[in-house]
Amino acid sequence: MRLGLKEKSETKPVLIVGAGPTGMTAAMELSRFGVPIRIVDKLLTPSTTSRALAVQSRTLELFEQRGLIQEMLRIGNPATAATIYGNGKCLGQVHLEQIKSRYNYILLISQAETERILREQLVRQGIAIERGTEMINFSQLESSSQAGQGGVKAVLRNFEGVLEELEAAYLISAEGSHSMVRHALNLQFQGKSHKQSYALADLYLDGDIPDDELSIFTAEHGFLGVFPMGNRHFRFIATDPEKHEKTDDDPTLAELQKLYDEDSHIPVQLRDLTWSSRFRINSRMLHTLREDRIFFGGDAAHVHSPAGGQGMNTGIQDMIDLSWKLAMVWHGKAVPDLLNTYEEERLSVIRGIVSKTETATDAFNSDSVIVHQLIAHIAPVLLSTQLVQQLSTGLISEVAWNYRASSLSQTDRVHGNLRAGDRLPDLDVSIWESDASGNAQSGKARLYEIIDPSRFTLLVAGGESTTDLSPTWKEQLSPWDGFLKLQRITPAPNQPEAKIQFDRSFGSGQSLVLVRPDSYLGFVGDHDALPALTKWLNQWFPPIAN
């Protein structure tokens, strides 16, 4: 048996328009899965300004699995708390060290550096970004979502004005907020534009602002944020009440100092302005992420307030979700309906992020004295509770989002807390293998060291450690040889806390947990759930006879 849908595999490349973090993540992922790609960007050179700054825990986990984490950690500056000030005093802290991840902080790193790390990875994978190349027209070849049919015809124009007509299997719009593809398809980018103007800058400062915390100040006319990038280099963002009318002039150091002094009670001296700009917040999103063979991700699909540092992370995770599914369908290893789950899963996350960042922005930017008095009185109470700390750190870090409502997620009788659609927690475990004599041998590992981001991993969790996997199991799963990795795990020895976390997650009995390539769970069941699992596999990834 082999896995695949006969005569349904593709040959044409996937065209990615836009080479920011979203587009480069798509290129990296699709290439890893053996899908030919073209990635174009109309800019001749990469941007050198920092723009997005925060890399969240969930993104760091995904980057670790793809070999990018060491360079990120070498350059980035971790922030372990977010301190909120108002009325000249500290109102409370969000304790980021409570994030349920190995990366229990926000890593502050210039977007230009994040893009450099992704570009270097593309070079290692043999991918060249076609810069100075713009897609000027496109059309869908056929109104069909069936694999092996249809496609997208695109017209590209390079920096010399040379035109090229390209047929692609799929098109990914990662062009940013002014997506030509979105406009051409007349898709509604629903939401609102905030009236406030903001000053944004990278600069250095002297004073008592911590190097390992996000410092956020509330004021009657808006808010001020000062975020450490390391070595006294900071990102500065503030509501600029005097610039509500559209203006193209960049704020000066003197203007930034004035904004700081008006909003903060902590004396500092700003210096050495690296760059600055003004902007307004748009809070908008598409309500569909797919038009047949065309997919949207990142700012082409959603833009929102920078509150919480979610934007770039959301775009990267859009492509982590889409790419493995697109690759499976491209290779003929999955039913075409798998692609519908991209929109199912990511739209729910996007709606939540847009809603929550908009609420926070409206509150902090309110010109109502009453609202700011409420913040000053309520924030200390809320931030002192463990529940609010858990909720806030889970959402900020993006480790709390799940795909439980997805049609791809199936839970079948479980005893632990994990459900299909959840992110796999990175626990310390014992792994079990059989030696040449059939005897079980164990080793110790982290779950994220075990799972394979290029295929599914079936974890057989718990049960008797000396019991080998049943030959019947292996026989029933044989149609998916090479498609999924089978691994027995038990709690790590001599670690009481690790056993508590293991039992809380998987239950005290034996369970079957199928981990997707993006480390979310596709199927969760107890030890008798193998028939339900094979039915699930047949539904989405049916094998066929040679």
Which residues fall in each region the model found?
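Core Rossmann-like FAD-binding/catalytic domain of the broad FAD-dependent monooxygenase superfamily
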Residues: 2-391
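Helical substrate-recognition/capping region of FAD-dependent monooxygenase/halogenase enzymes
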Residues: 2-17, 32-33, 89, 101, ...
